[in-house]
A protein has these predicted regions:
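RNase H-like (RuvC/DEDD) metal-dependent nuclease/polynucleotide-processing core
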Residues: 19-25, 29-291
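Intrinsically disordered, low-complexity segments enriched in serine/proline and basic residues
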Residues: 1-18
Length: 291
């Protein structure tokens, strides 16, 4: 009932709407030859103090001579000049070490800012571990090392150029470089955790929203909390789609994180964090939504 009530409100609300709108796009990528990529568009109406999921473009695949990458680009480009941010769920820039053009002494003795930070951070963490491991700055970034150790919930942050993320980074880079829009990086699992805890959702649901057997129910609970609290308006068919399709759900979460960043509700870089390194946008622990 709460879902249907929120859906009815969304239909009535958008039918009557006139005025300013702020848009945020979220992208959940899959492998370039797969058909799982999704794009979501979230709209914020300051006059009405409402957030609305206006569109989901799902299961984007290559057809004949038309690539899925071009479909994604054209869809986003249609909003050029009307979007505050485009949020990718993967990195699109190679680790800084991999792009450095300075004479290389080896990362064991390199004095570049981010290498010094990574070395110090790694040394502090390795004091607690056996066997000790050295970091690899050509595959991983400072932000991944930071988030692995400094947030309240342990999460697996794979290296940007690790086996799992490297193909997605290449695809995101290809798409992003053609866009003339502000782009940010989001780690959906962390955004879901922070948003869910702010809504007092069970930790089990937040930890297993991707699970093959219980993920659908976890996504339903999370979406129910957002809609029943009037924090986001979602059409019923989109609600069902996001319950059934995790890529669609995470694209929505990426776009929603873009809204939180726009309203100053994502975490800033910590003091001393390398100035030339990438950053992942993720929500603060305490959030305020439009009411």
């Amino acid at each position: 009932l709460a879902v249907k009530s929120a859906v009815k409100s969304a239909v009535s609300f958008t039918a009557d709407f006139t005025g300013e709108v702020q848009r945020f796009i979220g992208i959940s990528l899959s492998g370039g030859k797969a058909d799982k990529a999704c794009v979501a568009v979230v709209e914020h109406y300051p006059k009405f103090k409402k957030i609305f999921l206006s569109k989901i473009f799902e299961k984007i695949k290559t057809e004949a001579e038309l690539s899925a990458d071009l479909k994604i680009h054209d869809f986003i480009q249609g909003y050029e000049g009307k979007v505050e941010s485009v949020a990718f769920d993967v990195p699109w820039i190679r680790p800084f070490c991999n792009r450095c053009d300075l004479p290389c002494p080896g990362y064991e003795s390199c004095q570049v800012e981010h290498i010094q930070w990574m070395r110090k951070h790694n040394q502090l963490e390795q004091k607690k571990k056996k066997p000790k491991k050295l970091f690899t700055p050509y595959t991983e970034r400072s932000v991944e090392m930071y988030l692995k150790t400094e947030i309240e919930e342990p999460m697996n942050f794979g290296p940007a150029l690790g086996a799992n993320l490297a193909p997605l980074l290449a695809r995101a880079s290809f798409i992003q470089r053609r866009l003339d829009l502000p782009c940010i990086e989001v780690f959906p699992k962390l955004s879901i955790w922070r948003i869910g805890r702010a809504l007092d959702i069970s930790k089990t649901h937040l930890r297993y929203h991707r699970h093959s057997t219980s993920g659908n129910e976890s996504r339903r609970v999370i979406l129910q909390a957002l809609t029943s609290n009037n924090l986001a308006f979602v059409y019923e068919q989109d609600f069902r789609l996001m319950v059934e399709n995790n890529h669609a759900f995470e694209a929505f979460i990426c776009a929603l994180t873009g809204y939180l960043r726009y309203t100053g509700q994502t975490e800033a870089r910590p003091a001393g964090f390398p100035s030339n390194e990438d950053w992942i946008e993720f929500p603060k622990e305490k959030l305020r939504f439009p009411t």
